Amino acid sequence: MSESVWNGFQHPVPENGIVEVLGHAKILKRILLALILVVATSAASSAFAGGLTMVPEGNRHAEQPKIPGASVRRTRAGRTTFDDKYEKIRDLLASDKKLIAKVRSTAADYGIDPIHMIGAIVGEHTYNVDAYDRLQTYYVKAAAYAGNSFRFGYGDESIQQFLDRPEFSKCGDFADSYKLWTCREGVWEKSFRGRSVGGTSFPDNRFSAVFFQPFYAGQTFGLGQVNPLTALMLSDMVARTSGYPKLDENKAAAVYDAIMDPDKSLAYMAASIRRSIDDYKSIAGMDISRNPGITATLYNTGGSPQRAAALAARGGLPEENYYGWLVNDKLAELKSLL
């Protein structure tokens, strides 16, 4: 590179002008950095103004990410395989035209592509539970739970007594069920999880596992395998969109009816997917609506606001887990069910 280009001006560098040249170089560097910043900012602004970053279809991973040991052990204990379980739920969906019609209708109500719901159903019944030969089994179980008398709580403390503790007073400002229960879950994590408070020792476990699973830990039910806390969070959206009654944490049987009745369960499933898509748009600036593997991953993991925030902080595109990978890998076959 010539001297005249090096110093940024159309003059040769004098022998004793090294300091001056270095000064010019620093100025040039600042100007270039400023220009780069302006260009980058403009590009980001244009991209945001023109829409969101569209997450493309397909898997980011060439091979399926590792399946958790718990899922492997459950499947092995059931003397079956993941391939067998996948084929079982696929065949159930293929043979139940009424269910597919309900999936399509519910998806339309929530403004999502029905393939997202198919992906969530397939993922749940491949990795978490076995599919039932007949959908009516869910109706029978729903009726059985509705007839039982039980409550949400921990030990002798009901959920209502627990929420009356002063630590939860700040959550009283939220009227929307999603914001309200997200706040309460945050208080649990910060002030109670794994701690001894007011003479009670609380487990180092999730809020939903400690207070909202009166039968056994890891409890989810119904076609969409929704847990009670998730249903309570989505209650307002489902009430507005589908017209089902709002849920009350003090009426546990009604909550279980909502997540086990197939029709109601579909509404909560769709609401959960809708929430994940909205969270990634508003928090991470990402449109994940064309990648069922990503929405399936979030349906499996939960925590879409936290995950969207983490993605926004680190940059890049979201990646599917083992559960979402299967959905994308089988996408053509799953789309044929619709």
Question: How would you name each of these model-derived features?
Answer:
Residues 133-134, 139-157, 290-338:
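Catalytic and substrate-binding regions of cell-wall glycan-acting enzymes that process beta-1,4-linked
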Residues 174-190, 201-207, 213-289, 298-306:
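Alpha-helical segment that forms one wall of the substrate-binding/catalytic cleft
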Residues 21-33:
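Bacterial N-terminal signal peptides that target proteins for export
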Residues 114-121, 125-233:
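Acidic/His-rich structured neighborhood in mature extracellular/periplasmic domains
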Residues 112-119, 288-298:
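Alpha-helical scaffolds flanking conserved acidic
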Residues 40-44:
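N-terminal signal peptide c-region/cleavage motif recognized by signal peptidases
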Residues 49-104, 129-158, 163, 251-261:
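N-terminal export signals and maturation junctions of secreted/periplasmic proteins
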